[in-house]
A protein has these predicted regions:
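Short amphipathic alpha-helix that is part of the acyltransferase structural core
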Residues: 1-37, 50, 54, 150
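Short loop/turn motifs at secondary-structure junctions and domain boundaries
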Residues: 40-46
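Short, high-confidence coil segments that cap the C-terminus of an alpha-helix
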Residues: 47-48, 111
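Conserved beta-strand in the GNAT
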Residues: 52, 57-68, 79, 84
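Helix-adjacent hinge/juxtasegments
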Residues: 69-77, 81-88, 92-94
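Conserved acetyl-CoA-binding loop-helix of GNAT-fold acetyltransferases
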Residues: 85, 91-104, 116
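Conserved active-site alpha-helix within GNAT-family acetyltransferase domains
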Residues: 108-112, 118-143
Length: 150
């Protein structure tokens, strides 16, 4: 099995377009929306980063940091978003290492706490995330769990 390489988009700006296309494919959010959030990170205008794991030149996992991940708790910011690991790489700690890298970079920039919304239980707690309440999804679709990492 190929070795895993973890990097931020700042470390590999040539991955801007492939990363935006990959996130679009996984989540259905327009590619342009990802590019609009990735470019300020690349230019240094924002510390809200994008993180990738590569295996043999292919993206094996990724996540980003944005102001708000489509919920009504706008006061809980920033948010980890778009956490995804390709099925063949699950169970190898890919998401955990990406989460740790994002939290560490944000903390180094003086940004803490960090939040995320998810319906998963038990996974994020393994990486130091603490359940802190519920938020209503944008559009009123339902409630989702909110986690915090200090």
């Amino acid at each position: 099995m190929a070795a895993l390489e973890y990097l931020s988009l700042r470390q590999a700006p040539e991955l801007l377009n492939p990363a935006a296309a990959w996130f679009h494919e996984k989540w259905g959010v327009p590619r342009e929306a990802y590019l609009a959030r990735m470019r300020p990170y690349l230019s240094g205008e924002s510390e809200y980063g994008w993180y990738l794991c590569q295996a043999a030149g292919r993206i094996a996992g990724g996540l980003g940091v944005i102001d708000n991940d489509f919920h009504d708790r706008k006061d809980l910011s920033p948010n980890i978003c778009a956490v995804y690991t390709e099925p063949e790489w699950r169970g190898r700690g890919v998401a955990g290492q990406l989460l740790d890298a994002a939290v560490a970079d944000l903390r180094a920039a003086g940004i803490s706490p960090v939040y995320l919304v998810t319906d998963h239980t038990g996974f994020y707690e393994r990486y130091g995330w603490v359940f802190c309440g519920m938020a209503r999804e944008d559009g009123g679709w339902g409630l989702t769990r909110v986690y915090r990492h200090d």
